[in-house]
């Protein structure tokens, strides 16, 4: 009965990916943002558990759903038809503009000034230089104890790619839910 809320962010699952796509603020910048009412901003998905009294508890880390990388198209539905809501998160971006190597070496001020002063820009070459790293989707199966288990590979959704949307419904009218996931450049 009570609706829960799941929101996605872009916290990578691996520490390596976190270090290669995230630019961390130094202490002074962090404090300036807090003082400027930007509050404390941290990358992570949020799973808001409805407490039934007009309040919610954030349980994403407890539930094992906090980190799903570049996330789009999250759905909450009974994926495995066991009566418990599961979570699907579609992932991937074809050209990863958050890659810090790209930002530091290709999209830096020196190259921007060169493009402006010389007036030359090879857009195709520039796009080809941006990293393209396919990642798998996440299919979190409800474990019935406020936690979820990623079963994407077991359910045929673990192939790395660039998915950015999904929908579900009983498309063939057989009484169970069907899933459609769209992929880019596959």
Give names to the regions the model predicted:
Residues 1-186:
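Acidic, glycine/proline-rich Ca2+-coordinating loop motifs
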């Amino acid at each position: 009965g009570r609706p829960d809320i799941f929101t996605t962010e872009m916290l990578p699952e691996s520490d390596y990916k976190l270090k290669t796509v995230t630019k961390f603020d130094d202490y002074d910048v962090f404090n300036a943002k807090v003082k400027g009412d930007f509050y404390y901003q941290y990358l992570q998905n949020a799973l808001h558990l409805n407490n039934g009294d007009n309040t919610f508890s954030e349980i994403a880390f407890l539930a094992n759903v906090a980190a799903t990388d570049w996330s789009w198209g999250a759905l909450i539905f009974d994926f495995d038809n066991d009566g418990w809501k599961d979570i699907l998160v579609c992932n991937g971006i074809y050209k990863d503009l958050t890659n810090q190597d790209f930002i530091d070496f290709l999209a830096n001020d020196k190259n921007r000034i060169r493009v402006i002063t010389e007036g030359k820009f090879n857009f195709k070459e520039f796009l080809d230089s941006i990293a393209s790293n396919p990642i798998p989707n996440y299919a979190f199966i409800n474990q019935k104890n406020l936690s979820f288990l990623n079963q994407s590979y077991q359910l045929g959704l673990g192939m790395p790619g660039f998915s950015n949307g999904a929908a579900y419904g009983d498309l063939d009218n057989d009484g169970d839910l069907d899933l459609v996931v769209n992929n880019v450049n596959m």
